[in-house]
């Protein structure tokens, strides 16, 4: 490809909507263009990289015996009604009606469709195990699209589903996909960590999330450096604080004007935040989007409520619980915003974190403006409807496995695998007959990769970008080599550039020739910005048969003969183009 003929434009300025390096660089490098909020188009160079990621995924899926199919993005609502998710899924689902009023959705996921496919064709244990996958567009009506493809409304995912006769078969399929995902993300040049995760809206009995580690990620993981514990914050079990051995003091109502936050009341009363009680207020909704209850959740003042744990404790869908309208909840339950405590609350579900019964003499809101109560004790002064772990695991908290201090890291969720069991096969009637002609529900697994997210997350790795632009790994780079022709009108330089271009192409190297009539500085800046791994510069040395050879990851440039440069480029590309060299690092 010649850059002069390519649909290609770079930006010098940072687009206003871009906040993180990967989003900034993809827009500046002309890899993507914004169509609307959360909707992007892939330009030629971006599309080349995207295809390479897809092909790596296909190679690893095929190697595990998975077969590729393609299903419609438009999914009938009745399939989702069979699984029970049509009413449970929240406003993120795009719903449409056809001219006859029949409900459809733009698929945010594909469990129902794949289950429908196999229930009609798999009838015998002899047909199991089976594994099918697709790479296709997905749609979610994100309330606040941001960070480019990290949280977009239209994105590409790889869906993979395994179908087994029993849990042992599922365990084997799950292990194979765990290994395949490790290979995919390694070959793409990601620094990542598999962690235990909550199953969320997908459901099932077990899950791992693959998190690409970078400071800009929205996911937070917990891990222990002493043992093998690694988990998302949402999934992490917590060790309760040691019970306090102290006398229960009499409750004392105190005036605390204007102290609506934990920090303010702790400072005003000169107590540690650990000695306070934090309240979070919620309202829950029924299937008709009407408020059907209120919830007050209490944790120690220095902690945060873990919404995943709270949702699981209440047995509600994550879309059916939101922060309460405090004015309405005050009228119904007696709470007061900023001064809510458990004493005096009524007509709401009270959830207490599991460590609260062991603490003594806490400061809590008095359910009265500008007042708190000192020396509030669980059991004597208040009780909860549910006592369960609903707190986040904090940095430095003891590991629930070995007791060593927990560490936190941020990252981007690029993939997740689930043990679905019979969550979908039972309600949808996907069964098989065993050797004795007895019917059993098919045992399923679900495995997803965010292809769009992976595309962007690669750049957010610290080693894959710098102040000048992208540094693509060879395995996913749009081209392996860029030839920068300094003077296209110079006959000798042009002949040398053409020779390199032709010989590299014949050797299977993907090469782009920058033959634009631009200033050398513009060409160098663009080559750095788009991140092609190898740059060969053809300039004044061409008359003596010399070129300049530079790796994008390295600062040094070396002068080589034309033949040496060609040979070195071919050797480097062949060693790195499939990404398997990362396994040796």
Where are these regions (language model features)?
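NTP/phosphate- and nucleic-acid-binding module
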Residues: 1-585
């Amino acid at each position: 490809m010649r850059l002069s003929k390519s649909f290609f434009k770079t930006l010098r300025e940072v687009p206003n909507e871009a906040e993180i390096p990967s989003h900034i660089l993809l827009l500046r490098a002309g890899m993507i263009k914004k169509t609307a909020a959360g909707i992007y188009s892939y330009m030629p160079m971006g599309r080349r990289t995207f295809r390479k990621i897809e092909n790596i995924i296909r190679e690893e899926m095929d190697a595990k015996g998975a077969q590729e199919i393609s299903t419609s993005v438009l999914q009938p609502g009745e399939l989702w009604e069979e699984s029970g998710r049509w009413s449970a899924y929240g406003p993120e689902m795009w719903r449409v009606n056809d001219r006859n009023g029949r409900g459809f959705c733009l698929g945010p996921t594909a469990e129902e469709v794949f289950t429908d496919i196999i229930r009609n064709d798999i009838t015998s244990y002899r047909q199991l195990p089976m594994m099918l996958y697709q790479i296709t567009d997905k749609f979610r009506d994100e309330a606040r699209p941001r960070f480019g493809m990290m949280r977009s409304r239209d994105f590409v995912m790889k869906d993979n589903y395994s179908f087994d006769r029993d849990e042992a078969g599922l365990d084997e399929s799950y292990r194979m996909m765990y290994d395949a995902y490790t290979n995919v993300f390694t070959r793409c040049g990601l620094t990542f960590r598999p962690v235990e995760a909550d199953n969320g809206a997908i459901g099932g009995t077990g899950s791992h999330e693959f998190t690409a580690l970078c400071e800009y990620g929205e996911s937070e993981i917990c891990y222990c450096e002493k043992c093998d514990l690694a988990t998302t914050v949402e999934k992490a079990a917590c060790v309760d604080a040691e019970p306090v051995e102290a006398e229960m003091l009499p409750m004392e109502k105190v005036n605390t004007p204007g102290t609506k936050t934990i920090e303010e009341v702790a400072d005003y009363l000169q107590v540690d935040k650990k000695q306070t009680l934090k309240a979070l207020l919620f309202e829950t909704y029924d299937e008709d989007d009407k408020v059907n209850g209120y919830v007050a959740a209490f944790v120690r003042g220095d902690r945060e409520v873990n919404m995943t744990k709270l949702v699981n404790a209440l047995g509600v869908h994550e879309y059916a619980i939101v922060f309460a309208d405090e004015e309405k909840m005050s009228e119904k339950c007696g709470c007061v915003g900023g001064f809510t405590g458990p004493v005096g609350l009524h007509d709401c579900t009270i959830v207490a974190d599991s460590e609260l019964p062991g603490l003594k003499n806490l400061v809590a809101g008095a359910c009265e403006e500008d007042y708190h109560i000192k020396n509030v004790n669980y059991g004597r002064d208040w009780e909860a409807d549910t006592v369960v772990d609903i707190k986040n695991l904090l940095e430095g908290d003891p590991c629930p496995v070995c007791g060593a201090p927990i560490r936190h890291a941020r990252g981007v969720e690029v993939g997740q695998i689930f043990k679905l069991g019979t969550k979908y096969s039972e309600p949808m009637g996907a069964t098989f007959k065993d050797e004795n002609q007895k019917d059993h529900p098919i045992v399923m697994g679900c495995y997803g990769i965010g292809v769009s997210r992976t595309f962007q997350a690669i750049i957010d790795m610290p080693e894959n970008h710098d102040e000048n632009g992208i540094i693509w790994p060879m395995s996913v780079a749009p081209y392996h080599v860029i030839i920068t022709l300094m003077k296209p009108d110079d006959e000798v330089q042009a002949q040398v550039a053409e020779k390199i271009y032709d010989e590299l192409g014949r050797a299977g190297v993907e090469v782009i020739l920058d033959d634009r009539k631009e200033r050398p500085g513009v060409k160098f800046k663009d080559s750095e910005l788009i991140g092609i791994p190898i740059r060969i510069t053809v300039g004044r040395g061409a008359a003596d048969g010399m070129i300049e050879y530079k790796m994008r990851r390295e600062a040094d440039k070396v002068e080589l003969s034309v033949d040496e440069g060609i040979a070195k480029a071919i050797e480097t590309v062949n060693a790195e183009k499939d990404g398997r060299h990362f396994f040796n690092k």
